[in-house]
């Protein structure tokens, strides 16, 4: 064992003495190497975080799309129209169009998730840091974001509209009065139920839109802060590189004039 610092002996020098013996260019070189290694590890960690985020988005999109598209198909098949009731033409057209668009949007998101997710899962299960380069999540980033937006934003809004239209189609014929020319129209219990569901769903849809906009702005602000932090780290690396490039330049001594 080596004695403590301050004891006069011929043992190895203390760490403070070693630090004093290191010249300034060597210290700059070591700092640059350390920062480069940290930057490489941080880039790999960032790639792995993007991979896990893409995988989570695809899983959420596939589950949500399968659930909501299945509900829309069952709702269209199982709904029973009253043959003796005169439905408004616009109601049936809106219900059919909303159901079709809802199923198409969610099937598109489900198709993207089904095609990309197995390739990402295969890479994420390999216990190797460099295997992240084999994942297609960087190249398919726009497709993943599009599928996630279709499934969680557009698909959810269409689902809310589907619920409202389904309530009108289902409850409108209930206790509908037969109005003659001498009688005034009255709101039936079925119409009241449909109006109530619409009055509840419209504010909820507005709250959903406000939350989606607020969440998107918060996410963009967080990404912007992270970009500024990475730019500052790159500026520090560039400064250290500049100091390393000029460490061999001769220092000009001041000239004294008589």
UniProtKB/Swiss-Prot annotation:
The chain crosses the membrane at residues 64-81, 92-112, 146-166, 193-213. InterPro entries: CRAC_channel (IPR012446), Orai_sf (IPR038350). It is a multi-pass membrane protein. GO terms for molecular function: store-operated calcium channel activity. Its main location: membrane. One of its GO terms (biological process) is adaptive immune response. Coiled coil: none annotated. Glycans are attached at residue 182. Residues 82-91, 167-192 are extracellular. It comes from the Eukaryota. GO terms for cellular component: membrane; plasma membrane. Keywords: Adaptive immunity, Calcium, Calcium channel, Calcium transport, Cell membrane, Glycoprotein, Immunity, Ion channel, Ion transport, Membrane, Transmembrane, Transmembrane helix, Transport. Residues 1-63, 113-145, 214-258 are cytoplasmic. It is found in: Cell membrane. Ca(2+) release-activated Ca(2+) (CRAC) channel subunit which mediates Ca(2+) influx following depletion of intracellular Ca(2+) stores. Belongs to the Orai family. This is Calcium release-activated calcium channel protein 1. It comes from Xenopus laevis (African clawed frog).
């Amino acid at each position: 064992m080596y004695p403590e610092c301050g004891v006069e002996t011929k043992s190895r020098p203390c760490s403070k003495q070693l630090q004093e013996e290191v010249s300034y260019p060597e210290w700059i070189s070591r700092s640059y190497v350390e920062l480069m290694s940290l930057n490489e590890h941080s880039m790999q960690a960032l790639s792995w975080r993007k991979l896990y985020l893409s995988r989570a988005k695809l899983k959420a999109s596939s589950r949500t799309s399968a659930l909501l598209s299945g509900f829309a198909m069952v709702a269209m098949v199982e709904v029973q129209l009253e043959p003796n009731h005169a439905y408004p033409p616009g109601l049936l057209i809106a219900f059919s169009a909303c159901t079709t668009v809802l199923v198409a949007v969610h099937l598109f998101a489900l198709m993207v998730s089904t095609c990309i997710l197995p390739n990402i899962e295969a890479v994420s299960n390999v216990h190797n840091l460099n295997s992240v380069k084999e994942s297609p999540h960087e190249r398919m980033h726009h497709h993943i974001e599009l599928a996630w937006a279709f499934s969680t934003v557009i698909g959810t809004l269409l689902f809310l509209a589907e619920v409202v239209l389904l309530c009108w189609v289902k409850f409108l014929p209930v206790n509908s009065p037969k109005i003659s020319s001498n009688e005034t129209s009255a709101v039936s219990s079925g119409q009241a139920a449909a109006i109530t569901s619409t009055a509840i769903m419209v504010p909820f849809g507005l709250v959903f839109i406000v939350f989606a906009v607020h969440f998107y702005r918060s996410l963009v602000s967080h990404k912007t802060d992270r970009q500024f932090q990475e730019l500052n780290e790159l500026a520090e690396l560039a400064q250290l590189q500049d100091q390393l490039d000029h460490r061999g330049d001769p220092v000009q001594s001041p000239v004294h004039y008589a």
